[in-house]
Structure formats: C-alpha cells, structure tokens
Amino acid sequence: MNNSPLLQCSQVRKAFPKPDGEELLVLDGMNLELREGQIMGLLGRSGSGKSTLLRLIAGLAEPSAGEVQYLGHPVVGPARGIAMVFQSFALFPWLTVFENVALGLEAQNMPRAEIRKRSLAAIDLIGLDGFESAYPRELSGGMRQRVGFARALVVHPNILLMDEPFSALDVLTAETLRTDFLDLWAEGRMPIKGVILVTHNIEEAVLMCDRILVFGSNPGRILSEIKVTLPQPRNRLDPSFRDLVERIYVEMTARPKGAGPGGRQERFPGLGIGSVLPHVGSNILSGLMEAVAAAPFNGKADLPEIASDLQMEIDELFPVAETLQLLRFAELEGGDLKLTEDGMAFAHADIDERKRIFLRHLLAYVPLAAHIRRVLDERVSHSARKSRFIDELEDFM
C-alpha cells in the first residue's frame, strides 16, 4: 500500500461575494489528507461547508485560497479518478439503468464493448443484475441510489466522494445499502482506494469511518479529528461504540474556549439584536422539554439516547436543544441536555402557564423580540410596519 496521500487539502478557503461587496466566508483553514485504505467522515451540521469542501475536492469548484492536491498534483477542474455519489439520486429519467451507468464512460471515448463490459460489471457488483433495462421511475429509492453508486464505480475511481448518500432513504433501506457497501469495501471488490463520506448522522460516521473530522460552522472549519479503531463489522450496542458516539456528541456541544469576557466560559450563550435565530417552532421546543422531563430522563437526558428515542439526527436535535439553552430552559453540557428549573416548570405546567413562562423567557433572552415588543408598546395603535424592523436588521447582514 502506497504511504503517500491520495488527497491533500492545504489551507483551503472558500468565500462567496455578497451584493454589498463583502464576502461570505464558508470554509477557512481546511487542512486534511486521505490515504489509501481509509474511509474518512466529514461530520457536522447543515451549513458547516461539508458539501462545499466535497465539490472543491472533486474539482467542481475552485478554492478562494489554498490548494487541493490529488496524487500530488493540483486539482484544476473535474479530476479523473475522483467520483461522487449524491444525496439525491440524480438520474436521467429518460435513460435506463444501463444507460445511466454507462453515461460516465461515454465521455472517455472508450470502445463500446468495454463500456458494456464495465457497466454490466458495476451493475452486477452493486446488486442490480436483471434491472439493466428498467427506468428510474420503475425502481425503489434504494435501487435508484444503487444506480448512483454503480455510475460512480464504473469509472474505476481511486477516491469515492459520498455526499449524504443514505439520508434520502428510509431507515431499513439505508441500513441495507450501508451494510452492502461496507461488505464490498472489506472484501476489496470495489476499485476505489479511499472514501470521503459527508454525513450529519453520528452513528453512521462511527459505523463506517476510520477517521472522523468534526466540523464547526460560520465559517466551516475542522474542530477535531477522531480516529475510529473499532473492528469491522461494528455493533451499535457495543459499549465501545456507544462511548465513541457519546464522545462525539460532547465534542459537538462543547463551548468554545474563552467564550466569555476575559476568557471565561459563559454558562449560557447570549444573543444580540441581529443574531440569527434558529428556525424552531414552539411546539417542537415543548415536545423536547416534555420528553426530557419525563421518565426515564427526569430532567437530564444523554443526547445520543434522546436522539435515538426520538429518531432525530443532529441537524434536527441540535437546533432545538440550543434554542432551549438560549431561552434558559435547558443547558447543554458534556453531551447531556439538562432542563433548568424553569424548563421543568414549563414541562409540568398547563397551557396558560406555559404561555406566561415562554413569554417571560422570550422577552428576557431574545433581544429582537424585546425590541419589537417595546416598539409596539410605545405606539397607541400597537402596530408597526414589518419593513421598519427589516431595515434595522439589514445593518447586521
């Protein structure tokens, strides 16, 4: 096995121009490398730049600064030897399974006989033998995603990039396809030498990956790297597996060092009037508080456990948990979600008392809500144009 890296990213930065001439920084200071025989996971919430980084690696976009190297050479444009499987099935509906798979070879001016041979081999490898003449509309979601895998593998890439390839599938179909992929990888039956998997499913990352890079947001950056040394096949119920999942939850909910004045960490994060608020409904907040307040959690829940119980992934759970923390209804600490005294009171209150508690916390801890309330109270009509507040908020964009 060659010890030199298949892929290297050195100080990669990506920014997009904004209408006012400033730039929106999406990725900053990205340093990573992928070596032969590795499955590397990029784990983080939506908006942390994982998919953007994947497109830079594939040559579908250019970095604003830094360099991506494949086999020691800079990536400039789509790189032959790197293939991608997308979250959506991305199939041409007017083409058959065979034609969709063969499409990747058509542009390589390959002899027709070789195209047919390799396409049929990829279709058979991924478990679609007998469906060569079927159209995408005739296939289930899992089968359509298998076509996506076959189309990527038919070009015999060295590196396979997977952008949340299982997230659009139901739980059982995703588990089957994930297991089949790992079996093919372990048996060495696929032509690929390395894999980069983008996911926001912590258990999926621990189940599949040898290394996990945990991403932070605004801008996207690598917070930590976690090596997974558990033998394959991995068991979700194994204590070592659960410990690693717990460790990642702790990493992703840890407060930044020096977050408070003078380097002191604040117990609760604060908001400004222009802070971007999580898009979370009060019914979801109420539901999570009720779940944590009830047995067996009784006010303090282990995040992996509550996520499993409620069938929520990190992109669903974290915004809700963080909103509860912003409103002082709960505290995130060490991978746990602990309700405050007011959070417990809310969970056990009737509907009218809940409204009073929620209003009190909303006005106390969300400056924008307090500002809107103050403006309305100052007016005899108790009304104001929406554009007034939008104009004010534009100063923070």
Residue ranges: model-predicted function:
Residues 58:
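Helix-to-loop junction immediately C-terminal to a conserved catalytic motif
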Residues 134-137, 155:
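Conserved signature/switch motifs of ABC ATPase nucleotide-binding domains
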